[in-house]
Amino acid sequence: MNNLIITTRQSPVRLLVDYVATTILWTLFALFIFLFAMDLLTGYYWQSEARSRLQFYFLLAVANAVVLIVWALYNKLRFQKQQHHAAYQYTPQEYAESLAIPDELYQQLQKSHRMSVHFTSQGQIKMVVSEKALVRA
């Protein structure tokens, strides 16, 4: 995902804290998994009544993993093709026609960074006065 919708800048300290916390938590998670697997191999869990409960949790985890994998594959197939078409590139003449103004007035709109736009009573653009002309007047 190179084109993120929301991008926020973080300070290097905040980024470092995030990376360190993530590394510590993943290390602890791996340690807990390792210790649990070692206890399973020693046979202690298999001698108690917790065996059926552990089997249920294991089957539940496997079913959850299967559902997540199927859902991810479905989304990959669903969103594999680009659904949004690129926006149509209008020409300056088409813009001028859509605003019902002459090409010269459209060019003046394009050149001005700051302007005052005057409209007719029907809401069409009548005149554009750029900021330079406003300052001189």
Curated annotation (Swiss-Prot):
Effect of a null allele: Cells lacking this gene do not synthesize PGA.
Top-level division of the source organism's lineage: Bacteria
Q: What triggers production of this protein? A: Levels of this protein are positively controlled by the second messenger c-di-GMP (at protein level) at a post-transcriptional level. Increased levels of c-di-GMP lead to increased levels of PgaD.
Task: Tell me which UniProt keywords the record has, alphabetically.
Answer: Cell inner membrane, Cell membrane, Membrane, Transmembrane, Transmembrane helix
* Chain ranges on the Periplasmic side, renumbered to this chain: 45-53
Give the UniProt record's GO annotations in the biological process aspect.
cell adhesion involved in biofilm formation; cell adhesion involved in single-species biofilm formation
Q: What does the record say about its membrane topology?
A: Multi-pass membrane protein
Can you list the GO cellular component terms from the UniProt entry? Answer: plasma membrane
The subcellular localization recorded is: Cell inner membrane
Q: Which residues lie on this side of the membrane: Cytoplasmic?
A: 1-23, 75-137
Please give the InterPro entries that the UniProt record associates with this protein. Answer: PGA_PgaD
Pfam families with a match to the protein in the record: PgaD (PF13994)
| Stretches that traverse the bilayer | 24-44, 54-74
Q: What does this protein do?
A: Required for the synthesis of poly-beta-1,6-N-acetyl-D-glucosamine (PGA), a biofilm adhesin polysaccharide. May assist the glycosyltransferase PgaC in the polymerization of PGA.
Could you identify this protein by its name?
A: Biofilm PGA synthesis protein PgaD
Q: Which organism is it from?
A: Escherichia coli (strain K12)
The gene that this protein is the product of is pgaD
